Amino acid sequence: MGGSPVPQLTTVTQGLMPSVRMDFRARRPLRRLAFYAPRARRRLFQNHIHPEQRRVLVGEGDEEMLPDLPMEIDIVIDRPPQQPLPNPLVLLLDDVPPHVPGFAPYRVPRPHPMIPEEHWDQF
């Protein structure tokens, strides 16, 4: 995955990138982001926050309300190094539509060509 001189940032990036990659795959405009180097991908992610992603503060004892999220993602990128981290920040993905398996969203499905019955004798 590549590293960073700041160990917390490496941990954050490893926890963050799978959901980011999933979101980029789900909406096609940024699919080439997956081919970039990890550091470039992290920089691009800083500049492009999706409207479907919002950050929520998870307080003590509120983890039961969000059962399917990772328990703890500290996003160190946005905070100056002088300030300590608050409660764990969780990146929440909203409204990412699941795709039907085998269906490419950028391809238009076309009906199969039908041969009328009156032309069956030609085959």
UniProtKB/Swiss-Prot annotation:
InterPro entries assigned: UL21a
GO cellular component: host cell cytoplasm
Keyword terms: Host cytoplasm
Pfam families named in the record: UL21a (PF17636)
UniProt record similarity statement: Belongs to the HHV-5 UL21A protein family.
Function: Required for efficient viral DNA synthesis and the late accumulation of viral IE transcripts.
Intracellular or extracellular location(s): Host cytoplasm
Domain of life: Viruses
Protein name: Uncharacterized protein UL21A
Gene: UL21A
